[in-house]
Amino acid sequence: MNLKVRLAVMNFLEFAVWGAYLTCMGNYLGIAGLGDKISWFYAIQGIVSIFMPTLMGIVADKYIQPQRLLGLCHLFAGAFMIGCWWMGYEAGFGNELPNKSLFIALYTLSCAFYMPTIALTNTVAFTILKENNLDTVKDFPPIRVLGTVGFIATMWFVNCAFIDDAGFGFTLGENARKFQYTYMQFFVSGILSVVLFAYCFTLPQCKLVKKEGKVSLAESLGLNAFKLFKRRQMALFFIFSALLGMCLQVTNGFAGPFLTSFKGIPEFANSFAANNATLLTSISQMSEACCILMIPFFLKRFGIKIVMLMSLFAWVFRFGFFGIGNPAMPGVIFFILSCVVYGVAFDFFNVSGGIFVDQECDPKIKASAQGLFMMMTNGLGATIGTLTAGEIVNKFCSWEYFIVNGEKQSFLVGDWQTCWFTFATFALVVGILFAIVFKPEKKPIEKITH
């Protein structure tokens, strides 16, 4: 098999594992009696992202070849995720989990081993491409795009797949036993992780590179990058990175339960949007893939600050459109627009922010600085934002039982509009403050790579 195809398959599986549950997990948690803890399940991903990728990076640098470590991480992540499935299976369809603490522990351990694999996948791809004299700038983006395709593929699969007394099947209609509502989403994720574990051991070896001289623990952990906070503009940038990061996981955690809650309203119970929340939100990932291609033009035309501002104000529309829409026409158009604008909201800050860090930092600490940027957005910011969003949602909404087509189902219902407009207002305030206080030095952008 062609080397680039093999790496593309690796990326496909890597993100397929995540796509199986990331946007629909909240629906099952409500049924399992953990509806008020949805925010914690997404915050856990941010918490482990603060330290686990760094620790596994050190192991990959010194002790275990990256492709093998990637496989081992997926073995453990998959095993713990299958454990989550087993607990749901034992509890039975539509029933609360008897041991919620154990379920949370298994999920946390799965995340702890999965989150480092995102960076490890990049390391493996870059290392193998370079060792085979291939151009990473030219050859990596198409490989990475297959990751987004994998994420979308499993979103569509769990959205449509179901198992009931009649057997296994697919449907776009109303069915309470679709994987997007049940513990089966964890089974899909766990099995894919185990498949990727086996696949990793078929990949070419990545040689360990011994670094000359002694490297301090601070350097190994990337702590040198914290010196950047001494510079006002960099300190402001990282603070705003955390504030923007507070928006990142909100819709991953609550868009699914929000859209599905319309099934509790008779006029929307059989609507496409209410019954296919995971498929509908996959438009966000499609938009994300397309917007990556637009970034070079916007950066060269408008500069880094304007592109970052576009991202911040895109979050205003992302949340605002959810607050305006409903599953019927023309309201569903606002849901679609919210998903389309997600690509700008997510990509424009992440990519332009990475370029800003690359331009402003000493080459010796660029890698650590990029790690700090990711920690502030996906770690600290996402964790605080998700927990705060959870408190807001729990204040205005609650899980209630409904009978839909003869099946007892649980939906998170309440004043969703206030929740979405609160999130939109936060993004608007952050955007205005960013426009006023962040004043980066204008530098020419000669080359843009992803």
Which residues does each PLM region occupy?
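Juxtamembrane intracellular "pre-TM" segments in multi-pass secondary transporters
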Residues: M1, L203-I239, G264-P266
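C-terminal ends and interior cores of transmembrane alpha-helices
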Residues: L75-L97, F313-M329
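Helix-loop boundary and gating motifs at the non-cytosolic
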Residues: M1-I50, Q233-A269, N276-L280, N350
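A membrane-interface helix-boundary motif in multi-pass transporters
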Residues: C160-I191, E391-A427
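Central cavity-lining transmembrane alpha-helices of secondary-active solute carriers
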Residues: W40-D61, L279-I295
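Cytoplasmic membrane-interface "Motif A"-like loop-to-helix N-cap segments
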Residues: D61-L75, K300-L312
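C-terminal transmembrane helical hairpin of 12-TM major facilitator-type secondary transporters
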Residues: K305-G353
